[in-house]
Regions:
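Anaerobic metallocofactor- and corrinoid-dependent redox/one-carbon enzyme cores
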Residues: 1-207
Length: 207
C-alpha cells in the first residue's frame, strides 16, 4: 500500500519553522494516518487470504498537492534556496521514525514534472540537476522525473547517471533515475505534455 500525502506534510511543516518541532509534528500527523491504514489492512488480512506486505510512507505529490509547496511552507523561501536540504532531511527522518511495517521507498520523493511547485521552480532555474542530486543524499530517490532537452547526447546521460551511481555507492543506498529527454524540444523551450499526471516546465540548458 502507498500514500499520496504531500498535503499532510504541508500542514505539519507549516506548524513550526524549528526543524525538531516540525519533524515531530510530521511524525505524529502522518503516523496517525499510517496506523489507521495499517489497522484496516490487518483486518483485511485476517478476513481474506491477502497478505499485507507493508506501507510505503513516501508522501507522493500530484500536481497541486505539492511536496515542493510543503517544503516552501517550512523554509519560507523558494524550493532550491538554503534550508531546502534541511527540510528534505527532516521529512525523511520523520518517515523512518513512524512505527508501522514499511515497504517500498518510504522516503521523500521530489518528482519535478509531477508537482506544480517543483516544475515552476525548475522553470525559474532556482533548482538544477546538481541540486536535485545533492538532495537525493537525504531523500528516497535520485533524479526523479527530470525534463531534459531532446538533443541530449548519450555521453551526457551517461555522466548524469554516473554521478548518481557514484553517490549511491558512496552512501550505500539505492538511487534511481527517471530522466525524460523531450523529443523535438531544446533548452529554454517549454514541454507540451497532455498526460494527466505530468506538469509542463521549461527545459534548462544542460550543465
Amino acid at each position: 500500500m502507498a500514500l499520496q500525502s504531500a498535503n499532510v506534510v504541508a500542514e505539519a511543516l507549516g506548524s513550526s519553522h524549528n526543524p525538531a518541532a516540525a519533524q515531530k509534528a510530521l511524525e505524529t500527523a502522518l503516523g496517525e494516518h499510517a496506523r489507521a491504514i495499517e489497522n484496516i489492512a490487518g483486518n483485511i488480512e485476517k478476513q481474506t487470504r491477502w497478505k499485507y506486505a507493508g506501507l510505503d510512507l513516501s508522501p507522493a505529490p500530484l500536481k497541486e498537492v505539492s511536496i515542493g509547496a510543503a517544503i516552501e511552507g517550512f523554509t519560507k523561501a523558494k524550493f532550491g534556496s538554503s534550508g531546502t536540504m534541511t527540510a528534505a532531511a527532516l521529512i525523511t527522518a520523520a518517515l523512518h521514525a513512524i512505527p508501522v511495517k514499511q515497504a517500498g521507498y518510504s522516503g521523500l520523493m521530489l518528482p519535478i514534472l509531477e508537482d506544480y511547485t517543483l516544475a515552476r521552480r525548475w522553470t525559474e532555474r532556482t533548482v538544477t540537476v546538481d541540486q536535485m542530486l545533492a538532495y537525493s543524499a537525504v531523500c528516497g530517490t535520485g533524479l526523479d522525473v527530470i525534463p531534459l532537452p531532446g538533443d541530449i547526447s548519450v555521453e551526457q546521460l551517461e555522466r548524469m547517471i554516473g554521478d548518481m551511481a557514484t553517490l549511491a555507492v558512496k552512501l550505500h543506498k539505492p538511487l534511481s533515475a527517471r530522466l525524460l529527454p523531450v523529443a523535438g524540444k531544446k533548452a529554454s523551450e517549454r514541454t507540451e505534455f497532455e498526460d494527466p499526471f505530468l506538469v509542463n516546465a521549461t527545459l534548462q540548458p544542460l550543465p
